[in-house]
């Protein structure tokens, strides 16, 4: 491709039982992105979707912490360096975002919150976040709200009104701890693609824009 312009990158993860094609085949993310950029709601960006290694059903000899964790070093040590070496992207934390649906939301938490030197924007859609010790998890970052709020420029969690994944409870707990997190609700939808399409559409206008 001709040109010298460089772009920020959104790493977008699928959920359990899906693969890297989920967001394009069922989520129609390409249409969501095209419309948002064309309408001027979102800045032009590159979206990277990779297999999160969560196709097999959870519980087959894997703990909650281990399921999908094999993807973390792949993203950090292989995928990001490859993208930055082969595509015209801005290679710094200010221009990297990550988001994911369901278990991909958990992967987003695990990766971003343990690597705040690499990401500045994050979002989850119906995230599979259960039993998080807000005070101590992720090196205790949630107990240092000023540091978190400075490093993460935009943090959003969303879910549908017809699902019970504990997203609203998690948001309330984080807000009580002083964390800046935006909460988006998809009316009348459950743990399904309509919820996640809406979540992505509401997330992307808020990233890569310093306020």
PLM feature spans:
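Non-catalytic cap/lid and distal C-terminal segments of serine-dependent acyl enzymes
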Residues: 1-211
């Amino acid at each position: 491709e001709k040109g010298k312009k460089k772009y920020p990158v959104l790493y977008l993860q699928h959920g359990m039982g899906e693969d890297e094609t989920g967001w394009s085949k069922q989520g129609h993310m390409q249409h969501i992105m095209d419309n948002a950029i064309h309408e001027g709601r979102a800045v032009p960006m590159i979206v990277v979707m990779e297999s999160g290694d969560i196709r097999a059903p959870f519980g087959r000899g894997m703990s909650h912490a281990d399921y999908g964790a094999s993807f973390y070093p792949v993203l950090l040590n292989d995928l990001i360096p490859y993208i930055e070496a082969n595509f015209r992207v801005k290679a710094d934390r200010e221009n990297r975002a990550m988001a994911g649906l369901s278990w991909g939301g958990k992967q987003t938490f695990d990766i971003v919150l343990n690597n705040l030197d690499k990401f500045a924007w994050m979002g989850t859609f119906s995230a599979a976040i259960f039993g998080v010790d807000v005070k101590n998890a992720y090196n205790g970052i949630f107990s240092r709200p000023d540091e978190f709020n400075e490093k993460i420029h935009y943090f959003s969690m969303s879910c549908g009104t017809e699902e019970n994944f504990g997203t609203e409870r998690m948001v309330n707990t984080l807000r009580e701890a002083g964390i800046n997190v935006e909460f988006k609700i998809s009316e009348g939808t459950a743990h399904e693609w309509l919820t996640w399409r809406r979540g992505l559409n509401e997330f992307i206008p808020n990233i890569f824009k310093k306020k």
